Amino acid sequence: MKKRQVAIEDLFETKSVTNPVLAPNDSEAVFTVTELNRKDNAYYSAIHHIELETGAVTRWTYGKQQVRAPKWSADGKQLAFISNRSDTDQLYVMQKAGGEARALTNCTEGIDSFEWSPCGKKIWFSGAVRTGETFSTTEKKEGKMPQPIRVTNMKYKADFVGVLPQEVYTQIGYVDIATCAVFDFTSEPFDHTLEAVSHDGKQLVIAVNRNKNVDHDFSLPLVLVDIETKNETMILDEQGYFGEVAFSKDDRYIAYTGYALTFANVTQADVFVYDQSNGQTMNLTAGIDAPIGDESISDHLQQTIAPGVVWTEDEQLYFQLSSMGDVRLYAATLDGAIYPATGEEEHVYGYDVATNAEFALLTVSTMTNPGELYRQTIATGERTKLTSFNEDWLKKVELVEPETIHYTNGNTNVQGWLMKPANFTEGETYPLIVEIHGGPHAMYGFTYFHEMQVLAAEGYGVLYLNPRGSHGYSQAFVDAVRGDYGGGGYEDIMAGLDEVLKTENWIDETRLGVTGGSYGGFMTNWIVGHTNRFKAAVTQRSICNWISFFGVSNIGYYFTDWHLQAGMKDVDKLWNQSPLKYAENIETPLLILHAERDFVCPIEQAEQLYITLKDLGKETEFVRFPESDHNLSRTGKPNLRIARLEEITGWFKRYL
């Protein structure tokens, strides 16, 4: 069968295989499969079960719903998960022996997360509760007249949501599985995050900041709580982002991941272990100059829930690590030994490890495979493919294999990837599109990226790079962008373009395009304001004015401080690094794409840029996406994701 080129509509053909979770017996597992439904314009997911000895896969849940975070009871006889089948996220449990899943909660605001009690008779969970109410409150106040909202803190907005509900806090409770009776464990007017439950069922680790003013407080202390007495032991109280807690098998050690604000929010994450016997904490990964976790970005994967760490019975810890475009599984011992457990040039976006560390279950994507489930023997590296959800689609389409490139810009080494157009013919010349990722502390890597394949299928070469500010190349490299927006990162991108123009004679340098989102949108705006070498540009969810961003974005006031190293007391610096200042220089036709419920990079940024360019008589158009937030390209409504890609390809087709 002759293969066809990738199409925008293939978003509906590929499936996202994620979240493998081994049963306590290590002989079976569950995982989640998510797909886009064209008719309902929705995402639906289902839990699947696999017998590892036979490879038999069985679908366990059905219906038009999303399910997430399946977890086994300690005896392996029950499986709990969160589902939105009743509109709000609630907790459900099903028997391994069979039968329909049963709802355990009916909380007014839904639930966020949960952990089994090892006794198997109750489940701990967290969720939002309004002041004066409990998890058992079921009455919704209908027909209430609109009321003014009094805001007294600076962190009062969230992406898509907008203004956050007032007097609502995340609390922790538990539900009796037999009776569905729900009990409240916390009630203080602070947000409580459920992190972990000990294997003996006597302790919780929760995260809670009890400071009343958190405008400039970025701590979320980890607290060890005795369930019976509610006595607390502080594990960590430091400015930064920490979590993903896991008890060792004997409960002596408590592992967690995260980072302090040494380099603001671009500090590389590490794996820490707290020893209950002496109250000491060790950093297991301090010697690795790369971030713990998955920093790779793509537009295909859904619900990529991966544990921060997994303990084995011999007190080894397994975790993800992002480096040089790879996301690999690593292992560490308490005496400091660290080694990779998987290979290079792939994206291990989900995993679980057998108790005896004999094997791991992995969900893995590559540049030409959206992802499947695998079993890998730890000692030998031998790998067996367990699922084939995307196999039929892969048989139908011709994917382009990106080529890894390395180049230098002065003393800076930069990695990137170059894709030739589909159906490339030697001797012909083609237009090239430069893609720029957001963050800026993110990482392009060895993973499937639908947008890149679509552009190649449309006849474009694609160049995507990890310039300064990207994760995966050292702490100094990712930190280099702070205080230098539009500086070294811009130069790295231009140097990468110059490099491929020098080495690849198929690129038509008179037909260059550029696009990017978030920081990539900022950089797109900056580029067209500082060079006219591009013939078309598409800026997405972008920033053009740091002065207004400071007060309008939900992260504005601290992000500008951390990244621009300036605030409203240094307006000149904010304006000098604002692309809007250079709007008069823009000669490149610019398409502006923005989501209306983006509160990270608010749509007012796009509005300012559009009106300014129109007023100056520049070639520009503005497309607004309703009911969409900052994550439109990844998790937006399917029809709008399709429309977005059509807008991008249509603009480049018009001008290139």
Please give the residue ranges for each predicted region.
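Active-site-proximal cap/loop segments of hydrolase catalytic domains
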Residues: P467-L656
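A short beta-strand motif characteristic of beta-propeller blades
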Residues: V6-D10, T58-T61, R102-T105, A181-T186, ...
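Short, solvent-exposed loop/turn segments at conserved positions within beta-propeller repeat blades
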Residues: K39-Y44, R85-D89, V163-V168, V214-L220, ...
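Short loop/turn segments that connect beta-strands within beta-propeller blades
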Residues: L52-G55, Q95-G99, D176-C180, D226-K230, ...
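Predominantly five- to eight-bladed beta-propeller fold
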Residues: S45, A128-V175, N209, L220, ...
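Cap/lid segment of the alpha/beta-hydrolase catalytic domain
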Residues: F389-T510, G517, G551-V552, Y558
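Non-catalytic accessory segments flanking enzyme active sites
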Residues: N19-V21, W124, I149, D159-I172, ...
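Conserved beta-propeller blade repeats
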Residues: T14-A29, K64-A80, T108-I123, D159-L164, ...
